[in-house]
Amino acid sequence: MAAAAAAGAGPEMVRGQVFDVGPRYTNLSYIGEGAYGMVCSAYDNVNKVRVAIKKISPFEHQTYCQRTLREIKILLRFRHENIIGINDIIRAPTIEQMKDVYIVQDLMETDLYKLLKTQHLSNDHICYFLYQILRGLKYIHSANVLHRDLKPSNLLLNTTCDLKICDFGLARVADPDHDHTGFLTEYVATRWYRAPEIMLNSKGYTKSIDIWSVGCILAEMLSNRPIFPGKHYLDQLNHILGILGSPSQEDLNCIINLKARNYLLSLPHKNKVPWNRLFPNADSKALDLLDKMLTFNPHKRIEVEQALAHPYLEQYYDPSDEPIAEAPFKFDMELDDLPKEKLKELIFEETARFQPGYRS
């Protein structure tokens, strides 16, 4: 834990890192770190609560700039109880001085990944967590956004079992017609939660990839272990087919990539493993919904509104309290091709509203 900075004593240090967030945020305490930044909790002297502050230093890398800009653009436009918001952003007053960006968010005690390492969940908890994931996802999908990296560590939890989806750095506007060349190379989302079509096709992607990830998360809540822990690309596919069985001819016809289709045709026939054999203690309604989410063919996979209306979630289902976005989200430009200098300018502009004396 960093010592509390005395008023006016300059930035606090946390594990050798400068955290320049005073005077409003003090009493910093280390939480963890990701690929390009550290997260601390801090005391907000204005709202009198502890908050989470993520320090991001992305400006050396085009990919990190892209992810940072995506996350900020999306989260500043989203407003939903099951999606983490941005409360404040701290950065230098000029673009030349801006080396880091500090993002202030609600402090959540833990995440689903940490929880599943230590606790076996009751059916009631599984049901409530799944409902909140789908409630947040309904809003995301209504904005025409794909999260693309749903996994237990991106689901934040607090002691009252509130759940918030975080990390929109890989999110995209849904565009089933656009052929994202190089899709697989830039697709760094965790393999275990990846839909089979991501490994088999490169053309376009749809909201059904997020539903697949939610199915993987439900299976993990039922058993405290990942359902498809593939060691590499082909191993991942083999794990999936080992449980779902061989795809039907109709399902194979959806695979545009001939090499991928021929690979699947070359494999020995596998039978589907019954879900109640894998999860003998699970609620039968939970397994019915799991089956509809972990469907090989993305066109037959359940959609988020149908999933919310499934009998497993009937005690929570309330369409009048499951809000959607006001308007579909649009990125003005494809960020993939922009140089990091341009992305830095866009991050600077996007964060201006939090600067003292800002006038829109």
UniProtKB/Swiss-Prot annotation:
Changing residue 185 to A: Inhibits interaction with TPR. Changing residue 321 to N: Inhibits interaction with MAP2K1 but not with TPR. Gene3D superfamilies: Phosphorylase Kinase, domain 1, Transferase(Phosphotransferase) domain 1. It catalyses: L-seryl-[protein] + ATP = O-phospho-L-seryl-[protein] + ADP + H(+); L-threonyl-[protein] + ATP = O-phospho-L-threonyl-[protein] + ADP + H(+). The modification Phosphoserine is found at residues 29, 246, 248, 284. The active site is at residue 149. The modification Phosphothreonine is found at residues 185, 190. A motif (Cytoplasmic retention motif) lies at residues 318-322. A motif (Nuclear translocation motif) lies at residues 327-333. Phosphorylated by MAP2K1/MEK1 and MAP2K2/MEK2 on Thr-185 and Tyr-187 in response to external stimuli like insulin or NGF. Both phosphorylations are required for activity. This phosphorylation causes dramatic conformational changes, which enable full activation and interaction of MAPK1/ERK2 with its substrates. Phosphorylation on Ser-29 by SGK1 results in its activation by enhancing its interaction with MAP2K1/MEK1 and MAP2K2/MEK2. Dephosphorylated and inactivated by DUSP1, DUSP3, DUSP6 and DUSP9. Inactivated by pyrimidylpyrrole inhibitors. Keywords: Acetylation, Apoptosis, ATP-binding, Cell cycle, Cell junction, Cytoplasm, Cytoskeleton, Disease variant, DNA-binding, Host-virus interaction, Kinase, Membrane, Nucleotide-binding, Nucleus, Phosphoprotein, Repressor, Serine/threonine-protein kinase, Transcription, Transcription regulation, Transferase, Ubl conjugation. The modification N-acetylalanine is found at residue 2. Phosphorylated upon KIT and FLT3 signaling. Dually phosphorylated on Thr-185 and Tyr-187, which activates the enzyme. Undergoes regulatory phosphorylation on additional residues such as Ser-246 and Ser-248 in the kinase insert domain (KID) These phosphorylations, which are probably mediated by more than one kinase, are important for binding of MAPK1/ERK2 to importin-7 (IPO7) and its nuclear translocation. In addition, autophosphorylation of Thr-190 was shown to affect the subcellular localization of MAPK1/ERK2 as well. Ligand-activated ALK induces tyrosine phosphorylation. Its EC number is 2.7.11.24. Residues 25-313 form the Protein kinase domain. A motif (TXY) lies at residues 185-187. ATP binds at residues 31-39, 54. It is linked to Noonan syndrome 13: A form of Noonan syndrome, a disease characterized by short stature, facial dysmorphic features such as hypertelorism, a downward eyeslant and low-set posteriorly rotated ears, and a high incidence of congenital heart defects and hypertrophic cardiomyopathy. Other features can include a short neck with webbing or redundancy of skin, deafness, motor delay, variable intellectual deficits, multiple skeletal defects, cryptorchidism, and bleeding diathesis. Serine/threonine kinase which acts as an essential component of the MAP kinase signal transduction pathway. MAPK1/ERK2 and MAPK3/ERK1 are the 2 MAPKs which play an important role in the MAPK/ERK cascade. They participate also in a signaling cascade initiated by activated KIT and KITLG/SCF. Depending on the cellular context, the MAPK/ERK cascade mediates diverse biological functions such as cell growth, adhesion, survival and differentiation through the regulation of transcription, translation, cytoskeletal rearrangements. Acts as a transcriptional repressor. Binds to a [GC]AAA[GC] consensus sequence. Repress the expression of interferon gamma-induced genes. Seems to bind to the promoter of CCL5, DMP1, IFIH1, IFITM1, IRF7, IRF9, LAMP3, OAS1, OAS2, OAS3 and STAT1. Transcriptional activity is independent of kinase activity. This is Mitogen-activated protein kinase 1.
